[in-house]
A protein has these predicted regions:
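Primarily recognizes the serine-hydrolase "nucleophile elbow" in alpha/beta-hydrolase
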Residues: 115-179, 193-194
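Short beta-strand/loop motif that positions the catalytic acidic residue
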Residues: 211-213, 217
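Conserved alpha/beta-hydrolase "acid-adjacent" motif
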Residues: 218-227
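C-terminal catalytic histidine-bearing segment of alpha/beta-hydrolase fold enzymes
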Residues: 226-276
Length: 276
């Protein structure tokens, strides 16, 4: 059983420590260096955690959300816990992952995400979620992590995925250079590039997918999402793909994003339409 850091009453956040002793792979960041600020920006994570925001009237669905931050840090508020209320309102339990950065160890973020899925599965009864209705999602680099888990699942294969302005590929031509360099290093092998280029790993087994992105994203080229969309369609994967004309990158962090309410409505309608 996972170690519960703050066992609080139902419908209040519950935080789990991901690893009881030590993680399989260290990212080389010493304990005690973690920093955070009032915006929810977190850096130097060495002890990853999973914080669950249970729905008061749960439908059984849970979404594991991986905040973005370019594989350097985590936007844990705006791309994490801020989504709890709209999801809880439709019965979806939100779980926000505070994952470790690679720091030269590309396998580390995926290890944390796989472990988080195992915890949600193990604690499903207590959290009132259906093990068959656990999905994964993320924003920006967190979207890359989510899609990577879909491409290379562990013991628990997510039932669906939700991606906001995601990094999808490690192809140098149209990847996000910062995320690529921090995940794979300056001179990654072709095998490593291929492994982490998620548009190359779509199959008929890929679960239903929701993607929301802006056409004028200056940080992550739109081709990340359009190539992924084409691969999903080619493999007959149900996909809901939303491209907004403006918004740039990171608009979950922008309360003035013109399509913010529309995005949340489209997401919640999609989740409900799939019985989630």
């Amino acid at each position: 059983m996972a170690q519960v850091i703050n066992p609080i009453s139902a419908a209040e956040p519950i935080t789990y420590k991901l690893w009881q002793n030590s993680a399989p792979t260290s990212n080389g960041i010493a304990k005690g260096l973690e920093q955070s600020d009032s915006t929810g920006w977190i850096t130097f994570v060495s002890e990853p955690e999973l914080t669950v925001y249970p729905a008061t009237q749960p439908s059984g669905t849970a979404l594991l959300l991986c905040p973005g931050g370019g594989y350097f840090g985590l936007s844990s508020l705006y791309e994490g816990s801020a989504l709890a209320q709209p999801l809880n309102e439709i019965g979806v339990t939100l779980a926000v992952l505070k994952y470790r950065m690679p720091n030269g160890h590309h396998e580390v973020p995926r290890e944390d995400a796989l472990r988080a899925l195992e915890i949600l599965n193990d604690e499903a009864s207590e959290l009132k979620i259906d093990p068959e209705k656990i999905g994964i999602g993320g924003a920006s680099a967190g979207g890359h992590l989510a899609a990577t888990v879909i491409s290379h699942p562990g013991k628990i294969a997510p039932a669906f995925q939700v991606l906001f302005y995601p990094v999808i590929t490690m192809n140098e031509e149209f990847s996000h250079s910062g995320s690529r360099n921090l995940l794979l290093g300056d001179k990654p092998s072709e095998n490593l590039i291929e492994y982490f280029s998620n548009e190359l790993h779509v199959s008929s087994e890929t679960p239903p997918t929701f993607i929301a992105v802006s056409q004028n994203d200056p940080a992550v080229p739109l081709r990340n999402s359009t190539d992924y969309f084409r691969a999903l369609v080619a493999n007959n994967v149900p996909v809901s793909f939303h491209v907004y004309p403006t918004g740039g990158h990171g608009w979950l962090c922008n309360p003035d994003f013109a399509y913010r309410n529309q995005t949340l409505t489209e997401l919640t309608n999609w989740l409900v339409s799939f019985g989630r």
